[in-house]
């Protein structure tokens, strides 16, 4: 039968015949991921189920990115649990020190995930890797423990929503805007346990980093996975990021059956923001401009890559952050950090008055390095803006692209780069 991209990848990882959506299949996994928050829970379950050794020490990644550098005793002890497990099991891909970055930027960058892979992670934004053609999805720590022990997991084959994006891409629009527009259109449950499969002329022209940014937020529409076809851009990205040997394109079959098709035309569209307190509360920047803010965060697994840093620097170069705003810039891996140094972007950020920090999730989840106080308002390039997500329950978060975030830092209110 003609298969969607999700069905095609799952078929490659199971001995069962993938014949219909909703079918339960037992699949071999390519990589199992956990972090400093979810790892200890998975480790406890791993030993609790009687497991002794991981199935493959090269196919597990433990990335200490959420509360690191360790912000307090509790977070330090969480890392200790993961570090000791990595030592006991001789895990190859353990990241904590100077090699550590935000997991969903780090793994594709280091070639640990790639096209056609099946990746499970104890983090909801594991779906990021669909940007390079992997079926990647978040799971609870018990399922991750079983995956670490057995190298297998079970999945219900998701139905697929095809998203076609066409038109002329405006200068200031990015993948983040496209994804926010989609979530605004279908809602936070519009793709509940479904795969989002992206295509169209705009997607074809989009950079791989832009695709990763979009796939990252598939879960914000309830998606099981967000998937992009493997093309020449994907192959080039993989070759440049320690994953050579990707020689063939991979896409859905002609005639594949979709539950629904969503068509978007971006011609003439302006940048958008997701207003408090849902990623689906999406409005054009022009409708909320002049909303005063106290903080900007540029980074995270959604928008902390080098293309994002370049966008932010383009806006900030030669300008100053408003005196009433804290602008926090967090390049999401050491590799991105070093590239920022080579290109002079760190100097641009510092001259503008930004606070430049380490590669950490930090403020995204209200962890550290940028917590919001009572009544404070932020523009962030992160992926969630639920009430209290970045601090006080009375604070507010507007989700945006790095271009909009940087412009907002300069003006002191929600603004697009075209306003400068």
UniProtKB/Swiss-Prot annotation:
Its cofactor is [4Fe-4S] cluster. It comes from the Bacteria. Pathway: Amino-acid biosynthesis; L-leucine biosynthesis; L-leucine from 3-methyl-2-oxobutanoate: step 2/4. GO terms for biological process: L-leucine biosynthetic process. Pfam families: Aconitase. It catalyses: (2R,3S)-3-isopropylmalate = (2S)-2-isopropylmalate. The keyword Amino-acid biosynthesis applies. SUPFAM superfamilies: Aconitase iron-sulfur domain. Disulfide bonds: none annotated. [4Fe-4S] cluster binds at residues 301, 361, 364. CDD domains: IPMI. GO terms for molecular function: 3-isopropylmalate dehydratase activity; 4 iron, 4 sulfur cluster binding; metal ion binding. It is an enzyme of class 4 (lyase). Its EC number is 4.2.1.33. Keywords: 4Fe-4S, Amino-acid biosynthesis, Branched-chain amino acid biosynthesis, Iron, Iron-sulfur, Leucine biosynthesis, Lyase, Metal-binding. Catalyzes the isomerization between 2-isopropylmalate and 3-isopropylmalate, via the formation of 2-isopropylmaleate. Belongs to the aconitase/IPM isomerase family. LeuC type 2 subfamily. NCBIfam families: hacA_fam, IPMI_arch, PRK00402.1. This is 3-isopropylmalate dehydratase large subunit. It comes from Desulfovibrio desulfuricans (strain ATCC 27774 / DSM 6949 / MB). The gene is leuC.
């Amino acid at each position: 039968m003609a298969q969607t991209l999700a069905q095609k990848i799952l078929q490659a990882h199971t001995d069962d015949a993938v014949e219909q959506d909703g079918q339960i299949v037992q699949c071999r996994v390519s990589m199992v991921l956990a972090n400093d928050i979810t790892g200890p829970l998975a480790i406890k379950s791993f030993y609790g189920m009687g497991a002794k050794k991981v199935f493959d020490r090269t196919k597990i990644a433990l990335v200490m990115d959420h509360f690191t550098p360790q912000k307090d005793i509790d977070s330090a002890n969480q890392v200790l649990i993961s570090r000791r497990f990595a030592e006991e099991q001789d895990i190859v891909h353990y990241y904590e020190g100077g090699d550590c970055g935000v997991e969903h930027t780090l793994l594709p960058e280091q070639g640990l995930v790639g096209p056609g892979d099946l990746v499970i992670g104890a983090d909801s934004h594991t779906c990021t890797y669909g940007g390079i053609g992997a079926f990647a999805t978040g799971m609870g720590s018990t399922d991750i423990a079983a995956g670490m022990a057995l190298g297998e997991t079970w999945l219900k084959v998701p139905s697929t929503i095809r998203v076609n994006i066409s038109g002329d891409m405006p200068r200031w629009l990015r993948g983040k805007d496209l994804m926010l527009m989609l979530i605004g259109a279908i809602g936070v449950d519009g793709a509940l346990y479904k795969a989002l499969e992206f295509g169209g002329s705009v997607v074809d022209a989009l950079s791989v980093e832009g695709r990763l940014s979009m796939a990252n937020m598939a879960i914000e529409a309830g998606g099981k996975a967000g998937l992009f076809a493997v093309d020449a851009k994907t192959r080039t990205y993989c070759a440049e990021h320690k994953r050579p040997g990707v020689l063939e394109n991979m896409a859905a079959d002609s005639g594949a059956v979709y539950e629904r098709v969503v068509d978007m035309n971006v011609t003439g569209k302006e940048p958008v923001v997701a207003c408090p307190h849902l990623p689906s509360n999406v409005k054009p920047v022009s409708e909320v401009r002049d909303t005063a803010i106290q903080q900007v965060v540029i980074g995270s697994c959604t928008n902390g890559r080098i293309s994002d840093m370049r966008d932010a620097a383009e806006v900030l170069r030669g300008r100053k952050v408003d005196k009433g705003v804290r602008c926090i810039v967090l390049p999401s891996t050491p590799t991105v950090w070093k590239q920022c140094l080579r290109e002079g972007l760190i100097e641009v950020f510092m001259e503008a008055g930004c606070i430049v920090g380490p590669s950490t999730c930090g403020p995204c989840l209200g962890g550290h390095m940028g917590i919001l106080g009572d009544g404070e308002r932020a523009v962030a390039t992160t992926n969630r803006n639920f009430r209290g997500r970045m601090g006080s329950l009375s604070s507010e978060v507007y989700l945006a692209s790095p271009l909009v975030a940087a412009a907002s830092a300069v003006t002191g209110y929600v603004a697009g780069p075209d306003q400068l």
